[in-house]
Structures are given as structure tokens and as C-alpha cells.
């Protein structure tokens, strides 16, 4: 172990959402004197992200803290904050790769949750030293012993060294810092070796171009050095180096084991991808850091401006968003019903919601979003394999040999009392149960493993899961591949014309229900016309559901007081004839509310 980095400790905090990760980070900053009283504010690391209007994939923050331990030595602690949400599992894995240790925060009132587990397993894969921290011990419902037993039973790591603390009250913070110094190993790697650094985060700055956060694994990173990126072999010159403590301050160099900021005149975020390896052009390292992946979107939807005059503004807004979010993709698309817009790809549902919210909030756009769809794999009768993310691009039914959909392995953690409701929900969503085990000695919590189609999880599975379990269930999922399914495209026809924006790919079992629901919804929101309007749901040429909006008509019999029936019939036939002619030339205007109503009913 080189002497120059014996005093460095790189660690991260992993926790389920709401287990107190950000508050704990604040307390560590307070305790080490990194923040002055004036700078101290709640959830400092999170706020920094919002203040810089940094996008959703750019969540890994890093802060350098100086700490004098009880042995009198001065240590440099680099805290790397990781995102907690399952959509960003790849970013979490890159942040973990930049550390040697991890604080595992478990809420003493809740116990071990699903995403805690998935993150712990990821940390163990990276051979990190894990220090369990039991948080929220100040709450009356906290049970430290039970939580300790659960950590040992469920995760299988020794919890006798677990540090009880309350981040809110500031109890036990000193013990955590001591534990980090004693248990987390210092970084290996020599400052004299060829340069090898891992990019674990990047974002776009309007003045400096792309700013990356790097962990130097070997060698030394200096100003004005010529560096090369492994994934695309592009060469750049180092313009700026810095460390966050907690605001960025410049440094002349970063040596092996250190974490810092690198700015090197990179103009596009696509060139500095998370997980890439940086090396020196003149003396490159032999091997890049393993595990680099291109992040691929899993969920797609169309985004259209409500007012077609906003199309240019939407295009500019998306171009700016992509600068800050390399996992987000978009391409132009046009719809006969909604006009011009874009087909966008996201990592998952949370990612989709955040992108849409940012477009509306930051760029003042009024948008319509089509139903989210996933990437289906289709084998045609000619033996070609197609990947389809848009129902409109589906080949005709007679040309489809095999229809496959993406499937997820879902791990759900739930208290025993709510197990029945969760099993019912998973079966409704075409889930297949793979495993079920009781956690801990008390058997109060259950881990259920299901295989479920991504299309079923995409809509509102997470919300439903929370509501049937009163917020106690937690979900973690990963893509398990593709499976053959009996799927079909459901088209909605208005007076015989298909409306492309309302087409969806559904399972045949569900098609009738879904079709009926959409037709009924449209009947409520499409205004009456001067002639009869037929709303139909169809699969291929087969109509499976129909609703009719009756015509607005004048009472032509009002002037006939009594009189012969043939006179009345003549007037009614004449009116009918007129309506028929109207129908031939008339087109139905579908109001914007109709699309919104249907998309809501789908969700």
C-alpha cells in the first residue's frame, strides 16, 4: 500500500429511499467542519443538485472531508453520494466502483427493504467493506435489536459492529466516522503507474462544457495533460481539476486514490459517458476499468406539444435536456391525430416522469404524452428480427411469426399482513411466482420473487403496490430477458378511421376489457356531432367493442299535430338522408381532453 494514500478513505452511503441517507450525509459534513454554520442547510447534497438544475442521472455527489481521528492522525474522507432509485442501478454500480467501503443505512423502525438488499449485493460484488448503520434510534417505534438480527439473517453480514445512530438528533455520528477510518481499507494503486481513472458521473455546464467526476485508480492526473477516453479513443487536454469540499475548489493534481472534478474541453455529454476509463495519451494503461455499459432506454412514449406552434421550443428543450442526461433519447415522430412531436426513451418510469416534469416546469411547455410502451421483439415470417417501441411501426398481423415482450424479475419485500393483497396484485399483472421466503427469525417480513412483463409494471404497478400494502412493500427489479406472449395491437377507430395516437399493444386476454374501457371514455368526452359517430376498438380487421354517439337532431315532427304516419315517416327519412350525406363529408374533431382522458384511464 503506497504511503501517499494511506490516509484516504473513499466510501458511499447506501440505503432504501427515506431511510435517512441525505440527513446522515449532512451530519457527517457538520461533524467534520466541512460546512460552516452559514452554509449548513437541510439535505445539502440534494439541494446542490437542484440549485445547479442538474438532471436526474447526475445525482452522484462527492464531498471531501478532513477528519482528525482519535489516534491523532489527519484523514481525508471522500463521501460519494449515490442515487437510491432502481431506475438508476447502473449509476449506483459506477459510484460503488469508485469506493472501498460503504455505510449501509437501515431504518430501525422499518428494517431491511428491497432496494437496500439490491444495493448491498451490488456493493458485495465490488468487494466493498460494509459498515451497517442503524438509523432513527430516537423514534419510539425503533427496535435496534430486531434490526440487527434482520441485517444478520437477511443480508448475512456481521451486525455486531453495527453503529446505532440518529442522524436527525446527531447521535452516534462520531462513532460512524471512527468506524470508517478503522474498517474501510485505504485505496491501493500507485501514483507512478500509468494513469487510469473512472468517470462515475458527468453533467453539462454552459460555460465549461462537460464536467466529470472521476476516481483516480492509478497514476496521477495533472493540468494540461493530454488524456484519452477508452470507449471512443478521443483525446482531450485537462483544463481544470478540483475537489468538492463541499464547493468546488481547484487543485493542481489528483493522485491515485483521490476523487475529484475533471474538466477537459469535452463538448458533448455523449463523449464522456459514466463508467468510461480515462488514461494518458502518451502512456496509456493496459486495461480499462471493467463493466462499462451503454445505458439503453427501457420505456418509450411520444411527447407532443398541445399547441403546434411550440414544436420548435420543444425541440430546443429536448436538445438541452440531452446535454444533461445521457440515458435519455429522442427522435422526431409525426401523428395524424396529434401533429408533430418526438418519440422519447427513458430508463424507467421515474425517469420518464422527471423528464416530463422538467420540460413543463423549466421550459413552460404544455405537453401531451402518449401511453408508455416497451420494446417488443418480433420475428417476421421471413425470419427477420425487429425491435418495435411504437405500436404504429408494428408489421401486419399476418407477417408476424413470433411476438416477444421483455420480462422482469421483481423482488418484493412486504410485511406478512399484506402478503395476500400483493400476491393478488401480481397475479392480475400476469406475474409468475418464482420464490417466497420469510426473512429473519420473527418471520414478520416476506420476500416474494415474481417474473412479470415489463409492460405490466410500466403503468402504475409501483403506485398500486404501495397502496395495497399501505406503503410498506418495497420493490426491486432487473431485466430478465424476453418471453413469447400472445400480444396484439389494439386500434381505436372513429367513424372507421384509425387514430394512431390511441393504438396500444396489449395481451389478447385483456384486449376486450381495454377496448371497451377506451370506447366508453371517448364516448363521454367527444362532443356530439350533427351526425352519428361510431367509436370502435379493433384487433386487425375484427371489431371487439363499439360505442355510438347519437347525432344532434332537430325535431322535424314538431309541426305535425296528429296527421298521417306516412307524412311523419317522409320527414324522418328526409332528415336521415341529410345526416348520411353530412357523414360522408364530415370529419370528427377529437378534442385534446379526449386524449388526456384516455391516457388517464389507461394508467
Curated annotation (Swiss-Prot):
<dbReference type="GO" id="GO:0005525">
    <property type="term" value="F:GTP binding"/>
</dbReference>
<dbReference type="InterPro" id="IPR005225">
    <property type="entry name" value="Small_GTP-bd"/>
</dbReference>
<dbReference type="InterPro" id="IPR000795">
    <property type="entry name" value="T_Tr_GTP-bd_dom"/>
</dbReference>
<dbReference type="GO" id="GO:0043022">
    <property type="term" value="F:ribosome binding"/>
</dbReference>
<keyword id="KW-0547">Nucleotide-binding</keyword>
<dbReference type="GO" id="GO:0003924">
    <property type="term" value="F:GTPase activity"/>
</dbReference>
<keyword id="KW-0342">GTP-binding</keyword>
<feature type="domain" description="tr-type G">
    <location>
        <begin position="6"/>
        <end position="188"/>
    </location>
</feature>
<dbReference type="Pfam" id="PF06421">
    <property type="entry name" value="LepA_C"/>
</dbReference>
<dbReference type="InterPro" id="IPR035647">
    <property type="entry name" value="EFG_III/V"/>
</dbReference>
<comment type="function">
    <text>Required for accurate and efficient protein synthesis under certain stress conditions. May act as a fidelity factor of the translation reaction, by catalyzing a one-codon backward translocation of tRNAs on improperly translocated ribosomes. Back-translocation proceeds from a post-translocation (POST) complex to a pre-translocation (PRE) complex, thus giving elongation factor G a second chance to translocate the tRNAs correctly. Binds to ribosomes in a GTP-dependent manner.</text>
</comment>
<dbReference type="GO" id="GO:0045727">
    <property type="term" value="P:positive regulation of translation"/>
</dbReference>
<dbReference type="GO" id="GO:0003746">
    <property type="term" value="F:translation elongation factor activity"/>
</dbReference>
<dbReference type="InterPro" id="IPR000640">
    <property type="entry name" value="EFG_V-like"/>
</dbReference>
<keyword id="KW-0997">Cell inner membrane</keyword>
<keyword id="KW-0378">Hydrolase</keyword>
<dbReference type="InterPro" id="IPR013842">
    <property type="entry name" value="LepA_CTD"/>
</dbReference>
<dbReference type="Pfam" id="PF03144">
    <property type="entry name" value="GTP_EFTU_D2"/>
</dbReference>
<dbReference type="GO" id="GO:0005886">
    <property type="term" value="C:plasma membrane"/>
</dbReference>
<dbReference type="Pfam" id="PF00679">
    <property type="entry name" value="EFG_C"/>
</dbReference>
<dbReference type="InterPro" id="IPR009000">
    <property type="entry name" value="Transl_B-barrel_sf"/>
</dbReference>
<dbReference type="InterPro" id="IPR038363">
    <property type="entry name" value="LepA_C_sf"/>
</dbReference>
<dbReference type="Pfam" id="PF00009">
    <property type="entry name" value="GTP_EFTU"/>
</dbReference>
<feature type="binding site">
    <location>
        <begin position="135"/>
        <end position="138"/>
    </location>
    <ligand>
        <name>GTP</name>
    </ligand>
</feature>
<dbReference type="InterPro" id="IPR004161">
    <property type="entry name" value="EFTu-like_2"/>
</dbReference>
<dbReference type="InterPro" id="IPR035654">
    <property type="entry name" value="LepA_IV"/>
</dbReference>
<feature type="binding site">
    <location>
        <begin position="18"/>
        <end position="23"/>
    </location>
    <ligand>
        <name>GTP</name>
    </ligand>
</feature>
<dbReference type="InterPro" id="IPR031157">
    <property type="entry name" value="G_TR_CS"/>
</dbReference>
<dbReference type="InterPro" id="IPR027417">
    <property type="entry name" value="P-loop_NTPase"/>
</dbReference>
<keyword id="KW-1003">Cell membrane</keyword>
<dbReference type="InterPro" id="IPR006297">
    <property type="entry name" value="EF-4"/>
</dbReference>
<keyword id="KW-0648">Protein biosynthesis</keyword>
<comment type="similarity">
    <text>Belongs to the TRAFAC class translation factor GTPase superfamily. Classic translation factor GTPase family. LepA subfamily.</text>
</comment>
<protein>
    <recommendedName>
        <fullName>Elongation factor 4</fullName>
        <ecNumber>3.6.5.n1</ecNumber>
    </recommendedName>
</protein>
<keyword id="KW-0472">Membrane</keyword>
Amino acid at each position: 500500500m503506497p504511503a501517499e494514500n494511506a490516509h484516504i478513505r473513499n466510501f458511499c452511503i447506501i440505503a432504501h429511499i427515506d431511510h435517512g441517507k441525505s440527513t446522515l450525509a449532512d451530519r457527517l459534513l457538520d461533524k467534520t467542519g466541512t460546512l460552516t454554520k452559514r452554509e449548513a442547510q437541510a439535505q445539502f447534497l440534494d439541494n446542490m443538485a437542484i440549485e445547479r438544475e442538474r438532471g436526474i442521472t447526475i445525482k452522484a455527489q462527492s464531498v471531501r472531508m478532513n477528519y482528525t481521528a482519535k489516534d491523532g492522525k489527519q484523514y481525508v474522507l471522500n463521501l460519494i453520494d449515490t442515487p437510491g432509485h432502481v431506475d438508476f442501478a447502473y449509476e449506483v454500480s459506477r459510484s460503488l466502483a469508485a469506493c472501498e467501503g460503504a455505510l449501509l443505512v437501515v431504518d430501525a423502525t422499518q428494517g431491511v427493504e428491497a432496494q437496500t438488499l439490491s444495493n448491498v449485493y451490488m456493493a458485495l460484488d465490488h468487494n466493498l467493506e460494509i459498515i451497517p448503520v442503524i438509523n432513527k434510534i430516537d423514534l419510539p417505534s425503533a427496535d435496534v435489536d430486531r434490526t440487527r438480527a434482520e441485517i444478520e439473517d437477511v443480508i448475512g453480514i456481521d451486525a455486531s459492529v453495527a453503529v446505532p445512530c440518529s442522524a436527525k438528533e446527531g447521535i452516534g455520528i462520531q462513532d460512524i466516522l471512527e468506524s470508517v477510518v478503522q474498517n474501510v481499507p485505504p485505496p491501493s494503486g500507485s501514483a507512478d503507474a500509468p494513469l487510469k481513472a473512472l468517470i462515475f458521473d458527468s453533467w453539462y455546464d454552459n460555460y465549461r462544457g462537460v464536467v466529470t467526476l472521476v476516481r483516480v485508480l492509478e497514476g496521477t492526473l495533472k493540468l494540461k495533460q493530454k488524456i484519452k477516453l477508452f470507449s471512443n479513443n478521443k483525446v482531450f487536454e485537462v483544463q481544470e481539476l478540483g475537489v468538492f469540499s463541499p464547493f468546488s475548489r481547484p487543485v493542481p493534481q489528483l493522485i491515485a486514490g483521490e476523487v475529484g472534478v475533471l474538466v477537459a474541453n469535452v463538448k458533448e455529454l455523449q463523449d464522456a459517458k459514466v463508467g468510461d476509463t480515462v488514461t494518458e495519451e502518451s502512456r496509456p494503461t493496459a486495461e480499462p476499468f471493467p463493466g462499462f455499459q451503454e445505458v439503453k432506454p427501457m420505456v418509450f412514449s411520444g411527447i407532443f406539444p398541445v399547441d403546434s406552434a411550440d414544436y420548435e421550443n420543444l425541440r430546443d428543450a429536448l436538445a438541452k435536456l440531452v446535454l444533461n442526461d445521457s440515458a435519455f433519447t429522442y427522435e422526431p415522430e409525426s401523428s395524424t391525430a396529434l401533429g408533430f412531436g418526438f418519440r422519447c426513451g427513458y430508463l424507467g418510469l421515474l425517469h420518464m416522469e422527471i423528464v416530463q416534469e422538467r420540460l413543463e416546469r423549466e421550459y413552460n411547455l404544455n405537453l401531451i404524452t402518449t401511453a408508455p410502451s416497451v420494446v417488443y421483439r418480433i420475428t417476421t415470417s421471413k425470419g427477420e428480427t425487429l425491435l418495435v417501441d411504437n405500436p404504429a411501426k408494428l408489421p401486419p398481423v399476418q407477417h408476424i411469426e413470433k411476438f416477444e415482450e421483455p420480462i422482469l424479475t421483481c423482488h418484493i419485500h412486504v410485511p406478512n399482513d399484506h402478503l395476500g393483497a400483493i400476491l393478488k396484485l401480481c397475479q392480475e399483472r400476469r406475474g409468475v411466482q418464482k420464490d417466497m421466503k420469510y426473512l429473519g427469525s420473527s418471520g414478520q417480513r416476506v420476500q416474494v420473487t415474481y417474473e412479470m412483463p415489463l409492460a405490466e409494471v410500466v403503468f402504475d404497478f409501483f403506485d398500486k403496490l404501495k397502496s395495497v400494502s399501505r406503503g410498506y412493500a418495497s420493490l426491486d427489479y432487473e431485466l430478465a430477458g424476453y418471453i413469447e406472449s400472445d400480444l396484439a395491437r389494439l386500434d381505436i377507430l372513429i367513424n372507421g378511421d384509425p387514430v394512431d395516437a390511441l393504438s396500444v399493444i396489449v395481451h389478447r386476454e385483456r384486449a376486450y376489457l381495454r377496448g371497451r374501457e377506451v370506447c366508453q371514455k371517448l364516448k363521454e368526452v367527444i362532443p356530439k356531432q350533427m351526425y352519428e359517430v361510431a367509436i370502435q376498438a379493433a384487433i386487425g380487421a375484427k371489431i371487439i367493442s363499439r360505442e355510438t354517439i347519437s347525432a344532434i337532431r332537430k325535431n322535424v315532427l314538431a309541426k305535425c299535430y296528429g296527421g298521417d304516419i306516412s307524412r311523419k315517416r317522409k320527414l324522418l327519412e328526409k332528415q336521415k338522408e341529410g345526416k348520411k350525406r353530412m357523414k360522408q363529408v364530415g370529419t370528427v374533431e377529437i378534442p385534446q381532453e379526449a386524449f388526456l382522458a384516455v391516457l388517464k384511464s389507461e394508467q
